[in-house]
Amino acid sequence: MRGLSASSVVAPWRERWINWRNRLVADPRFQRAAAASPLTRFVARRRARALFDLCAGFVYTQILLACVRLRLFEALASGPAQPSQLAARLDLTPEATHRLLRAAASLNLLRALPDDRYALDDLGASVLANPSVAAFVEHHALLYDDLRDPVALLRGETRTRLSQFWPYAEGRADDPEACAAYSDLMARSQQLIAEDVLDAYPFGEHQSLLDIGGGEGAFVAAVAMRHPELRLQLLDLPPVAQRARDRLATQGLARVDVRAGSFLDPQPAASADLVTLIRVLHDHDDAMARAALRAAHEALTPGGVLLVAEPMADTPGAEAIGEAYFGFYLLAMGSGRARRRAELTLLLQEAGFAGVRHLPSLRPMFASVLIGRRV
């Protein structure tokens, strides 16, 4: 054993243990014994349920889609109802209504009451409270089509619908019609995380904010409500910038300086002491992400702060969101990837930011927050 590091000794042992365990778990006799034993029955059933949920996940999402499209949650917003009352409103037969209600209740979207009425349960109420969730449920119809043949997607053999939906993934960033749909979707989803980001960092310590890739202005509008003293700027592509001007004007926020352009263009030097990139970097491959960070560095005053908020691949307890969901969503989109915190930290450091650190946020599965200072 002389000359071997501790890690080189541990690794083979760990691999032998994993191989032995996998052979055991894959043995049908062990599976039956584990399911029958009072000592292991709970674990065996839980894992069997987890495996079945993986197989049935598409069915569950389609049940949610049916609830959204039929506006079932809105129908129950004022209180519980009988299936017979709902059938006419949903334009379904009584049998189909019962089937949907029971299915939704099994997924904790609805709650079945003892008198055969149904009410919203926690998940259904959450969808109702966050219109952006329903918008994404509808939007996922594109993703499901792209995932019809996941092997072809992995091999790059298909032209995906998502890449057509996101115009900058196909080089159509100046097409106003193409930008309209995705800009509206992003504006809705920004509302879900804006308050979390504002709670995570003291924006009031700054004089001027530039939101790069700010879309239609949902985030800067939330900042304006919380910090009316901040001078606000937004940068996005020309068709999106015009939509931002119109949207912000209707909210009484014409004071926001909306700039039409790209982060690939030279930025006005020292134009803000706080720059934000809210769910921007993960949409782009490394070369474009570095360009966005260079633009942020150019725009910041010396010592100014860059704030990055986006889903990260290694968020504790939400690994499947970063690695599985965003991993395949961005593959279908044709651009970007969810990065681990260490990867983003390195990108920020390479772009000239020091003291990069993570800030706690309420729902890090949707947006984890990193900050760094320009040096």
Task: Write out the residue ranges for each language-model feature.
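Eukaryotic partner-binding/assembly regions in large regulatory complexes
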Residues: 2-28
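C-terminal alpha-helical "lid/dimerization" subdomain adjacent to the S-adenosyl-L-methionine
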Residues: 307-351, 356-358
